[in-house]
């Protein structure tokens, strides 16, 4: 928000300079982004009157004038402005004046005629970019007065960043309140007297959506002159706030917007039909806006309509059909309180952002509307003339926001601030902020003012007290806290340790949004319901993720499109699964996921370029599972997953319970996501592996180990893992190692079969095993494999 420092000082005028005032505003939480003078550096410019104005004898576009600047004689000045005329009050730069850019005014001759000064435009004084003509001052401007004093140009335009919670500061009144409280001064509010109705004309108003519009005020003003000139003082205030003067009706509503923070709108009364109806739009209903653009409305958009058409998007933008124009004589002034939730997001949906929507989305004081409409009525009649009818007020008290009553405990205040502020000072701060305060035994009970939506809980009051007391006044004392040694379960496996392991394996941690694209999620998890957001950031971020794969695969595509072909990413985070049995109907599971793609190794002269495969990621995952001490209990079983390749994927089971998946992305999904090359992913339910098995110390045998190799032929569909598990079960007492070291298909092995070469390592802790014992164990393994899998020894 941008405003004039002098306008602010009309409301409250602390005895501090501009720099200190800006510092106060910043420390109050309204960060000052910039301070700049409202006019250029100049001197020697005064108010003058054009006494004579005639055509230059030697130039068609120049005029020769005689100007009274309050001196002993009239000044001869040559001027080329088309609006120069006799009787006009103007800004005159006399001989010796210095204009912005160090431009010095000297006596000269222009086309043979003497010129003893210059009649100035706004642009020549560094006030604005208006080059259309010289400045036209009011007829009562005192001749000879310094123009800087007359126009109050020794002023600054202050621009502040207003946080969403401080919508009350989107008007001069809100900033002035804070400055008054900080300096312990009274607020000099302008006297706003009710404008008596001089006619009894009203216009019917119906509110069909009271929850969206709890209060709607309308007032008929007839017989206005819309061609009247907006006073210079108002145009200047608007300009210094960054708003261009348009016509007196719009200027008045903009003035009230800036002064009180209350948006208003004026309808051309003669273009309205029947009555004003505040309702929700019909699906697909259209409206042509004031800027000429046509928008198609949704059913959740609030509109102001008459008996025939929608006239405006409520709280956002007016319509062209009912807008005020140069032919307007009668207007209906609108002043309303709209529920912020009924406005939020609607403007953005249509690519709009207006001063009105900016304020209504954040919240407007629901007690302000009567004051605002009286202020606008008085200003409009003073400028344009006309007669006002009575105010029509349609209010649904049940739908208006209630003022929060908050308990502030002395103990909580002292603990959070870390400093004791006297009771009397706390009460004074809260009262000056507009709260109704009652002192209690434990602290205070405060009722928030109507304009402060952000005062809801105890911590809000603590913040307000600290803010007004002054953060700089709170002594710097080191934080003191009792040292409590928390117990640490040795069996707990820190997620940080797993992340470190993955980083050591060449992975990088990714952090992706919990909000994902429903199209991508639908490809990965078809036919699975997900939680949709009622007000998403965008369509591409409108559902909560069912797994981390959506974000990781999108990140992989993003990086591949930027010439990063070799990727190793992992992420830990929550997934959100609809579950009727869970709290609030949603289950949140902490997941650990990873993705790899590209080559197995970084490019190197001594290494072949090989693409990653299933076993690369499986090896990394087994390293993670080894940290838990449960790797021996983990099984990888063939199981269908729509996102994974049916022949290169597996479900991960721990003690018979499925805890995740691993596999190559399905070729069809790879194509739809535009993934480049083979991509392998895994995902684990972290809570299922977060507790590790504590290692047991075992005796190391001092007797020799014996290795025997066997090659068994089994059907193609028999998992090698099942073969190894069966061997371990049979030789549990003396078999200390089972390993698959070769898989063969081809000559000598029938089609549909494969040969698995397995090494069996046997060892005892008490003695050297005899050859007969070794042979017996190997024979038992072969027999068990033959019985369960119809395996046979390969010749």
Curated annotation (Swiss-Prot):
Top-level EC class: ligase
Any Pfam family: tRNA_bind
Cofactor entry: Mg(2+)
Lipoprotein in keyword set: no
Keyword Membrane part of the UniProt annotation: no
Top-level lineage group: Bacteria
Cofactor comment text: Binds 2 magnesium ions per tetramer.
Cellular component terms per the entry's GO annotation: phenylalanine-tRNA ligase complex
A single BP term in Gene Ontology: phenylalanyl-tRNA aminoacylation
UniProt EC number: 6.1.1.20
Domain FDX-ACB: 701-794
Subcellular localization(s) per the UniProt record: Cytoplasm
Reaction(s) the record says it catalyses: tRNA(Phe) + L-phenylalanine + ATP = L-phenylalanyl-tRNA(Phe) + AMP + diphosphate + H(+)
NCBIfam families xref list: pheT_bact, YtpR
Assembly, per entry: Tetramer of two alpha and two beta subunits.
Matches recorded under PANTHER family: PHENYLALANINE--TRNA LIGASE BETA SUBUNIT (PTHR10947:SF0), PHENYLALANYL-TRNA SYNTHETASE BETA CHAIN AND LEUCINE-RICH REPEAT-CONTAINING PROTEIN 47 (PTHR10947)
Protein name in the entry: Phenylalanine--tRNA ligase beta subunit
Organism: Pectobacterium atrosepticum (strain SCRI 1043 / ATCC BAA-672)
